[in-house]
């Protein structure tokens, strides 16, 4: 079992996370990371003997642990699908600071290769979120293929909205995404709603 982080370690990882979110993995220099943590480079290397990659690995592990606890677990938890997605919307809003925080997975992904140091973990994270969203859509009554399509679209909208927030310097795209997420996963297909309306007026 991994040794629990101390509060000091949690704060250190949080400060490193902000640098990677703002600058990206390749752009983050040791000088930037040291300045953000308030430690000298030698002290950082003492904490992280394998350097920047180890720092990013711990940041990613902490983020994925948070996601498992606050996103994946509620999606599979108790309550109606609507209640669970409402909790997830609230937690996503907090994690991404209402769209002001960039997507860590995107900022750690290598632009040059599909086999970067974090590629496997990032892929698993996306697949886990798609699977969790898909299960919720299935529980709401959608067919497997429809549920998968809704889940993939929801994940695309999540990360696309964060990219737009960063580019536009506005949190509006993320707020629009959060408002639309319950409907993206749970709402009846428009064709079904139209058929019900037609039957009602027959």
Q: Which role fits each region the language model picked out?
A:
Residues 60-66:
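Short, basic, alpha-helical segments at the C-terminal edge of helix-turn-helix-like DNA-binding modules
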Residues 83-84, 96-120:
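Amphipathic alpha-helical segments used for helix-helix packing
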Residues 1-7, 189-202:
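N-terminal intrinsically disordered/low-complexity leader segments
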Residues 95, 111, 135, 155-173, ...:
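Amphipathic C-terminal alpha-helical segment
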